[in-house]
Amino acid sequence: MKIFKEQQRFTQTWLIILLAMSIIVPIGIMIQEYAKENTKMTTNEFLLTLVGILVSVLFIFFFKLTTRIDEKGIHYQFFPFHFSLRRISWSEINSVNVRNYDPIGEYGGWGLKGGSLWNKAKGKAINISGDIGIQLTLKNGKKLLIGTQKESEAKRVLDTYKNKII
């Protein structure tokens, strides 16, 4: 019995740099305002605003995509949107394959994507980084793409369970 497990987080260097640069200006303006002699900003307001900015930016690092493939099906969780693993059993799947995709062109970027605002024909995507995903087409017609950084391992385990797709 083969099992595929993967956990991904938003840890890309470019994202960290972008987020750091995006908070420099607001924090700089806030510090400058607080440092003025006749400021109306209290210490509590300053600290609360500073913590608010930092927490809102750092929140993205709590996101985690967990994927598991086993004899029961394909399980996924995108925390904080899903608090537990969601399972798609093999009997619900019409087809599954690992493929390259264009995150921005096909789904509008990374994260929990798809639905009414983007290309409905592509279905939904749950991804953290990269351009490789596990593409599922379900028997009810819905499509789901789950991003992966472990292409060969995912293919190997999926090949083991393809006979379970009826």
Region locations from a protein language model:
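Short aromatic/basic micro-patch
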Residues: R68, R87, L145-T148
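Extended, compositionally biased eukaryotic interaction scaffolds
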Residues: I53-V55
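N-terminal membrane-targeting/pre-transmembrane regions
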Residues: M1-M41, G123, K142, V157, ...
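ATP/adenylate-binding site constellation spanning eukaryotic-like Ser/Thr protein kinases
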Residues: E71, W90, E151
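A membrane-cytosol interface segment of integral membrane proteins
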Residues: I3-F4, W118-I166
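Hydrophobic alpha-helical transmembrane segments
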Residues: T39-V51
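Transmembrane-cytosolic junction motif
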Residues: V57-G73, Q77-F78, F83
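Non-transmembrane, membrane-adjacent beta-strand/coil modules in membrane-associated proteins
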Residues: Q77-K142
